[in-house]
């Protein structure tokens, strides 16, 4: 098998006679570009892959315009892991470690005592934040518990990370009983059992329609057009310049003196470097002063 047209794609589908909806996503370049600028331990790479898949699936199932942040905070060797996504399936991820992490470390060994925080920020409407105890062995199980508690909807996730043809890849399936109350638990359990039979090479290597046929060839499945996923940082020179202006000018001048007249800032997410001399900083300050005068 070889890479297919469905790399970096998310598909939604509906089981017509079961009142269950589903999603499938595979992250190829979306995942590898997240890892390119960091030397994360293998276990952290896998965790970020799982979180990217989960965020992609969550963003698609909630059907709103805005952003979702899935964040892990703990007191273990992995201090922080965070993924941001939006309705355009633009994703980014970041992790911070504070001690060595073995390649085969479990979630609890990495996190220690920690929580999973899901922040939903619609462009229009109220923000929502859910906090979930990381008291289960995997992210998948914690998220399934989240859906039961917050949405009262049976939800099943399959999330895998690994390598395919020498490249990092992450993929997943989501099944959810329809929120209109017409779904039957036994139908959901049947489809969930079938989903668990998926092999890594199928999830990572098949096109969506072939994968769904292999899993659900006796079902009537309506597949909707795909949505592309991509790594998207969103950093910019303007944002970095404005971040410098959060400091007092006296402190900025001291930094310029210490750094031979040039302040450099590197994006923690994508690794892009931005350089600012005194003239550039003053240009940003003048623009900020104008906006303040206009009340913007």
From Swiss-Prot:
Keywords: Chaperone, Cytoplasm, Disulfide bond, Redox-active center, Stress response, Zinc. One of its GO terms (molecular function) is unfolded protein binding. It is found in: Cytoplasm. GO terms for biological process: protein refolding. The keyword Zinc applies. Under oxidizing conditions two disulfide bonds are formed involving the reactive cysteines. Under reducing conditions zinc is bound to the reactive cysteines and the protein is inactive. Belongs to the HSP33 family. Redox regulated molecular chaperone. Protects both thermally unfolding and oxidatively damaged proteins from irreversible aggregation. Plays an important role in the bacterial defense system toward oxidative stress. This is 33 kDa chaperonin. It comes from Actinobacillus pleuropneumoniae serotype 7 (strain AP76).
């Amino acid at each position: 098998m070889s890479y297919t047209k469905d790399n970096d794609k998310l598909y939604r589908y509906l089981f017509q006679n079961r009142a269950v909806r589903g999603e499938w996503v595979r992250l190829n370049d979306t995942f590898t570009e997240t890892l390119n600028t960091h030397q994360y331990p293998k276990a952290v790479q896998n965790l970020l892959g799982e979180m990217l898949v989960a965020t992609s699936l969550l963003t698609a199932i909630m059907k709103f315009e805005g952003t979702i942040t899935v964040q892990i905070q703990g007191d273990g060797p992995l201090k922080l892991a965070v993924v941001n996504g939006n309705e355009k399936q633009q994703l980014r991820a970041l992790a911070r470690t504070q001690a060595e992490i073995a390649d085969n470390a479990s979630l609890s060994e990495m996190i220690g005592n920690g929580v999973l925080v899901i922040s939903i920020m619609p462009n229009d409407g109220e923000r929502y934040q859910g906090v979930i105890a990381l008291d289960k062995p995997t992210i998948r199980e914690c998220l399934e518990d989240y859906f039961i508690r917050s949405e009262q909807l049976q939800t099943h996730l399959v999330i895998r990370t690994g390598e395919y043809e020498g490249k990092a890849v992450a993929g997943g399936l989501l099944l959810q009983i329809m929120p209109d109350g017409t779904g039957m638990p036994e139908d959901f359990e049947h489809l969930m059992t079938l989903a668990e039979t998926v092999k890594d090479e199928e999830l990572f290597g098949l096109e969506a329609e072939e994968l769904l046929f292999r899993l659900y060839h006796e079902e009537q499945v309506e597949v909707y057009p795909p949505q592309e996923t991509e790594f998207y940082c969103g950093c910019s020179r303007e944002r970095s310049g404005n971040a410098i202006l959060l400091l007092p000018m006296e402190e900025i001048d001291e930094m310029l003196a210490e750094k031979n007249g040039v302040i450099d800032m590197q994006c923690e997410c994508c690794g892009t470097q931005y350089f600012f001399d005194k003239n550039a900083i003053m240009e940003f300050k003048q623009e900020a002063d104008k906006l303040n005068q206009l009340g913007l």
